[in-house]
Amino acid sequence: MAFKIASSPHVTRNLHTSTVMQRVILCLLPGLVVQCAFFGWGTLVQVLLAILVALSCEAAVMKLRNRNIKASLSDNSAMLTAILIGVAIPPLAPWWMIVMGTAFAIVIVKHLYGGLGHNLFNPAMAAYVLLLVSFPVQMTTWIAPSTVALHSPSLVESLQLIFNVGAHVNMEQFRLGIDGMTMATPLDTLKTDLSMGLTTTESLTKAIFDGSTGVGWFWVNLAYLAGGLVLLKLKAIRWHISTGVLLGLFVASSIGFLLSPDTQASPLMHLFSGATMLAAFFIATDPVTAATSPRGRIIFGALIGVLVYIIRTKGGYPDAFAFAVLLANLCAPFIDYYVRPRTYGHSTS
């Protein structure tokens, strides 16, 4: 075997922040496209509105801090935060909610603590929790996927509903069901049915489910999984956190399902419903708010996965990734303190 010997210096090229953010955004696109295909133009409108607000807030804060506005906007961190918020909230949520959430994420969560690299919590998830706690009805009102809905809002109708101007139908009609079914996510529907005494098998016979997963949500999660795998291939993220999240959720949900299959969702449904793949590859992997060591990252991810299962099954919210990520952010310094790599030349860290 022939080896090519190159002269020194052997310099490796580090990825700039803007390059990493660009790769993450590009890998988000498959999931965004599939989500728009199933849930309409509203998702795209929310994303574009969030980007506009995020860039405006970023520029305003940089101006107040006498920092370089162009450099801050070009690192793409504000745009990524905006996209994550835009895909997380319901497609037809009122415009002022995405404005409020995005402004809170950029101004308070990110810049109040010093800007990029200094925030204690994931900005997108902090904004999501703020909106969910403040406006639970609007944040849990989803339209039915296009494959089962008798009427999906067009681009014009989506704009009218989001901005509440001149719409021939209102959000209440979509919520009550133009298509004759409740507008709730599969996880929310299953949780409600179980609380009413139905079994998992009985609940899964509803039109919003497709076998063992929710209609549309399986393909949305599959698209985000594909994007996440590309992200790993590009080395924009490391595998530890994503693996920890999925493994923690899979093990916890498998134990629950084996112990009580009539009252628990299957591991497949937990993995391919809600924001599982989006959170595992694009949210939990935020390097600023996560643990730093390889073992610490696995523990950090597994903690998120277990917390998601606990909150989904025992808590008041059907999808719990935002709460799980924020709680894990709180634990990250603790994990880093006790899970440190061994110092070279010493038997202990």
UniProtKB/Swiss-Prot annotation:
Bilayer-spanning residue ranges: 20-42, 77-99, 124-144, 212-232, 239-259, 265-285, 291-311, 315-335
Main location: membrane
Cofactor(s) named in the record: FMN
Keyword annotations of the record: Cell inner membrane, Cell membrane, Electron transport, Flavoprotein, FMN, Membrane, Phosphoprotein, Translocase, Transmembrane, Transmembrane helix, Transport
Disulphide bond pairs: none
Compartment(s) where it occurs, according to its Swiss-Prot or TrEMBL record: Cell inner membrane
EC number: 7.-.-.-
Bilayer topology term: Multi-pass membrane protein
Transcription keyword on record: no
PTM annotation (FMN phosphoryl threonine): residues: 185
Gene Ontology BP annotations: electron transport chain; transmembrane transport
Quaternary state and interactors: The complex is composed of six subunits: RnfA, RnfB, RnfC, RnfD, RnfE and RnfG.
HAMAP family: RsxD_RnfD
Function text: Part of a membrane-bound complex that couples electron transfer with translocation of ions across the membrane.
Protein name: Ion-translocating oxidoreductase complex subunit D
Annotated source species: Shewanella baltica (strain OS195)
Gene of this entry: rnfD
